[in-house]
């Protein structure tokens, strides 16, 4: 009986994790273009800083 409950708990946790991942993926997809642009700006800024340091 205890084993059955443990399996059920694991399944529920996995379902919750999958749901979170799906929600995160959706949020990421919505924000990814803005995020990518920001990261590219940071990379470019980082390259400039490295050049300035040398």
Curated annotation (Swiss-Prot):
Sequence ranges of Low complexity compositional bias: 10-21, 29-44
Keyword Plastid included in the entry's annotation: no
Keywords: Sporulation
Region (Disordered): 1-54
Keyword presence, Electron transport: no
Family statement: Belongs to the gamma-type SASP family.
Role played: SASP are proteins degraded in the first minutes of spore germination and provide amino acids for both new protein synthesis and metabolism. These proteins may be involved in dormant spore's high resistance to UV light.
Protein name according to UniProt: Small, acid-soluble spore protein gamma-type
Native source organism of the sequence: Alkalihalophilus pseudofirmus (strain ATCC BAA-2126 / JCM 17055 / OF4)
Origin organism lineage: Bacteria, Bacillati, Bacillota, Bacilli, Bacillales
Gene expressing this chain: sspA
